[in-house]
From Swiss-Prot:
Main location class: cytoplasm
Gene Ontology biological-process entries: regulation of DNA-templated transcription
Compartment list: Cytoplasm
Name used for this protein in its record: Probable transcriptional regulatory protein jk1057
Organism in which the protein naturally occurs: Corynebacterium jeikeium (strain K411)
InterPro entries noted in UniProt: Integrase-like_N, TACO1_YebC-like_2nd/3rd_dom, TACO1_YebC_N, Transcrip_reg_TACO1-like, Transcrip_reg_TACO1-like_dom3, YebC-like
Keyword Aminoacyl-tRNA synthetase: no
Region (Disordered): 1-22
Length: 251
């Protein structure tokens, strides 16, 4: 199990201040707006939009904010920005490979923010293609355990193309090929298994174990990157063991 995945599911516990929470809300709202613009404003006919709305609701984003974002994206209301997805590549402390996914209406600002965060936190930018080949696009669903066992989840999604089910502590994670994400979503719904989120992700083909010192430096860099309003996601090839995670949590 990739330690970064578990860290990501518990990260909201560490986002205690209002500024962090506000940034998280802004990223979720942006996802809704882009999904509505790309696939239309009707969630029942646009699974990506429905998933973005579900994730926002699970994160306690107010319904009014969600609805306004949907309308901006679909063109029902004015004010939608011209969002552009940009993927930056680089290396973090101790050579950890990183992909930084931005959703921005200002490419120059995004580039400056990412470069500044990398330079100040032991990272460096890399040429396009020099890091991305280490990662594969995957579909990833995250769900509360509830009464379900790992076998229950696997049984529900295996025929839909799921490759693995990972135990993240309080939650399960289902990983599939990116082309199978719709089938896995449908399988979860058919089995009446509620999920927090289901979206496309990047997973490292080979992960590199990290000790507590390296992990702490990389997580600090990720925090600095995610402080930028333009950064939506950060992916790494770092694997953090349960022992190292426990050591970091105790600090």
């Amino acid at each position: 199990m990739a330690g970064h995945s578990k860290w990501a599911t518990t990260k909201h516990k560490k986002a205690a201040n209002d500024a962090k929470r506000g940034k998280e809300f802004a990223k979720l709202i942006k996802n809704i707006e882009v999904a509505a613009r790309t696939g239309g404003g009707d969630p029942s006919a646009n699974p990506t939009l429905q998933d973005a709305i579900t994730k926002a609701k699970k994160s306690s984003v107010p319904n009014d904010n969600i609805e306004r974002a949907r309308k901006r994206g679909s063109g029902e209301e004015a004010g939608g920005a011209n969002w552009e997805t940009i993927m930056y590549e680089g290396y973090g402390p101790n050579g950890v490979a990183m992909l930084i996914e931005c959703l921005t209406d200002n490419r120059n600002r995004a580039t400056t923010d990412v470069r500044t965060a990398m330079n100040k936190n032991g990272g460096n930018m890399a040429d396009a293609g020099s890091v991305s080949y280490l990662f594969t696009r995957k579909g990833v669903a995250v769900l509360d355990k509830g009464e379900n066992t790992e076998d229950d989840i696997l049984l529900a999604v295996l025929d839909a193309g799921a490759e693995e089910v990972n135990d993240l502590g309080e939650k399960f994670e289902v990983v599939c090929e990116s082309s199978d994400i719709n089938a896995v979503r449908d399988a979860l719904k058919e089995a009446e298994i509620d999920y927090d989120s289901i979206e496309l992700d990047f997973r490292a083909s080979m992960e590199v174990p990290a000790d507590a010192t390296t992990a702490k430096k990389v997580f600090n860099l990720i925090d600095a990157l995610e402080d930028s309003d333009d950064v939506q996601n950060v992916f790494t090839n770092m694997n953090v063991s349960e022992d190292v995670l426990a050591e970091l949590d105790s600090e």
